[in-house]
């Protein structure tokens, strides 16, 4: 009759503020194709997990948002209840939604001289559907207010596709992985990496990748910069799951001032 694993960790001594999460037992016992396993983590890179990171023991659900990876684990129950009792479920969130693919900017010049090239950088979260490319678009804000309102609607796919989109460059894997790894090398047997410690493909699902683009100069004016992802299935952000309660995926918009 086992159907669900329910667990929670220590946050404070108030039972009303208990932070709970749960998983179907099938996800605990078997991994979807290409996905890492659900684990109880007590060490990271050979060192005991610090309290800041959720130690002494933390649940890690690789393809899920953070509320599934409960810190400071204290209780774990096996249940025949089919329904999720997650704390986030009580707040009208989709607790079974896996990570989405989306992108955002990291560095955008707020003031730019007219007709001079400028660079924009950002990162992309690579969800379960992978990442094919990152695209950017610049729109002059002199468009009519009605048209601007249609373009500002991140869920209006027709308006977004009417813009001119240019592919950015997805940067290669880092040469230094950090984390005090021996010889700065990903250990053999790590999911997604070959025997030499190099990624089998890039970007890796359930990771983040950096992107960059050098844009040509623009005439003086006020502009809106947008960036979006296209996943391995060809779905364009915020699709295929544009719902806010299923995780963040809206198309970021940044204002740019180009001065003469």
Predicted regions and their residues:
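Extended, aromatic/histidine-rich regions of cofactor-dependent oxidoreductases associated
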Residues: 1-260
């Amino acid at each position: 009759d086992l159907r669900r694993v329910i667990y929670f960790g220590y946050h404070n001594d108030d039972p009303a503020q208990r932070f709970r999460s749960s998983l179907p037992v099938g996800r605990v016992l078997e991994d979807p194709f290409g996905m890492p396993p659900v684990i109880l983590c007590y060490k990271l890179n050979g060192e005991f997990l610090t309290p800041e990171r959720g130690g002494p023991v933390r649940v890690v659900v690789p393809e899920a948002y953070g509320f599934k990876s409960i810190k400071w684990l204290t209780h774990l129950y096996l249940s025949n209840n089919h329904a999720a009792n997650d704390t986030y479920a009580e707040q009208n969130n989709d607790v079974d939604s896996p990570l989405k693919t989306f992108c955002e900017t990291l560095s955008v010049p707020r003031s730019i001289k007219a007709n001079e090239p400028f660079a924009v950088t950002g990162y992309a979260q690579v969800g379960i559907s992978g990442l094919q490319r990152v695209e950017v678009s610049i729109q002059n804000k002199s468009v009519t207010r009605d048209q601007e309102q249609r373009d500002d609607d991140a869920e209006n796919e027709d308006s977004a596709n009417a813009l001119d989109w240019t592919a950015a460059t997805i940067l290669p894997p880092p040469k230094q992985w950090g984390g005090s790894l021996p010889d700065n090398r990903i250990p053999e047997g790590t999911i997604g990496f070959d025997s030499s410690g190099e990624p089998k493909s890039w970007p890796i699902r359930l990771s983040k990748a950096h992107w960059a683009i050098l844009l040509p100069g623009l005439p003086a004016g006020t502009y809106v910069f947008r960036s979006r992802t296209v996943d391995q299935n060809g779905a364009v952000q915020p699709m295929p799951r544009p719902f806010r309660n299923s995780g963040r995926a809206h198309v970021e918009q940044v204002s740019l001032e180009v001065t003469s």
